């Protein structure tokens, strides 16, 4: 199987997001890379599921709370940006202040 660089990045993001989700489910507070991966992978899947850009942006702000991440991480994450694949093409999605 041959994957393009973009496909490899998406796969790595998915794997990192899955690892972060498992840790969150066990009650482990997420560090910075896990937090970004968790949010980004959920945004990718929401886009593939057919949500609009606006819906994905709103959804991204509901995924994590301050209690889900290590101390100081919420203050470090001002925005998360991804290029997501929607039914009508690839679009840039930005979620401002995703941890509330």
From Swiss-Prot:
This protein's record includes keyword Hydrolase: yes
InterPro entries in the cross-refs: Urease_gamma, Urease_gamma/gamma-beta_su, Urease_gamma_sf, Urease_subunit
Organism encoding this protein: Haemophilus influenzae (strain 86-028NP)
Record gene name: ureA
A single Gene Ontology CC term: cytoplasm
Localization terms from the record: Cytoplasm
Subunit structure: Heterotrimer of UreA (gamma), UreB (beta) and UreC (alpha) subunits. Three heterotrimers associate to form the active enzyme.
Keyword Iron: no
Sample GO molecular function, one term: urease activity
Keyword annotations: Cytoplasm, Hydrolase
Associated pathway: Nitrogen metabolism; urea degradation; CO(2) and NH(3) from urea (urease route): step 1/1
Name the record gives this protein: Urease subunit gamma
Pfam families registered for this protein in UniProt: Urease_gamma
């Amino acid at each position: 199987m041959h994957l393009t660089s973009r496909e490899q990045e998406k796969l790595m993001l998915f794997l990192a997001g899955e690892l972060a989700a498992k840790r969150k489910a066990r009650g482990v507070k997420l560090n910075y890379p896990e937090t970004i991966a968790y949010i980004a992978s959920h945004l990718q899947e929401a886009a593939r599921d057919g949500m609009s850009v606006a819906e994905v942006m709103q959804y991204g702000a509901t995924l994590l709370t301050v209690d889900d991440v290590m101390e100081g991480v919420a203050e470090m994450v001002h925005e998360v940006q991804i290029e997501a694949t929607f039914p009508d093409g690839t679009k840039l999605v930005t979620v401002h202040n995703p941890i509330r």
